[in-house]
Regions:
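Cyclophilin-like peptidyl-prolyl cis-trans isomerases
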Residues: 1-170
Length: 170
């Protein structure tokens, strides 16, 4: 059964940005809470609970994307990297193509429709073949050169130090 979130509007209004602290620096992502509300709520819940702290980017394909969010990449975890999740899944929110997979989008990874949980990927380049398949729930602002520099420097097994969902960039 898919997990659904019932987040009060005043709380959803604070889910504006994800601050992704990596071993290479900070990536700021603007969240699309109006277009993918359940996905953003799930990501915010996991981030605010510390789920992502200490994980790794376990799959990085140059010229495509960097994927993280698997708990099996945590120090001492026993499962295979890329196969773990939070213990639940969420439905895809891909009915509309408001946000194509351009460079710098964050999107839910999944093993098939409605199987996403905690794993996400950030695209290095436009990936239109993923439009309508994976839920885009945020993006790096196009003028945020620092975040793009950090994204471009990410390699496999780089650390996700922490992820916070915040109201404002600071």
């Amino acid at each position: 059964m898919s997990k659904r979130y019932d987040v009060p509007q005043e709380v959803m209004e604070t889910y504006n940005y994800a601050k992704i602290e990596t071993s290479k620096g900070t990536i700021w992502v603007k969240l699309f809470k109006d277009d993918a509300p359940n996905t953003v709520a799930n990501f915010a819940h996991l981030a605010n609970e510390g789920f992502y702290n200490g994980l790794k980017f376990h799959r990085v394909i140059p010229g495509f994307m960097a994927q993280g969010g698997c708990p099996n990449t945590r120090e001492g975890a026993s499962g295979m990297p890329g196969t773990g999740g939070p213990g639940w899944s969420i439905d895809c929110e891909t009915d509309t193509s408001l946000h194509p997979h351009r460079r710098g989008v964050i999107s839910m990874a999944h093993a098939g429709p409605n199987t996403g949980g905690s794993q996400f990927f950030i695209t290095f380049v436009p990936t239109p073949h993923l439009d309508g398949v994976h839920t885009v729930f945020g993006a790096i602002d196009l003028d945020d050169k620092e975040s793009f520099q950090v994204l471009d420097s990410i390699t496999q097994d780089d650390d996700i130090i922490s992820i916070e969902v915040v109201a404002n960039k600071s």
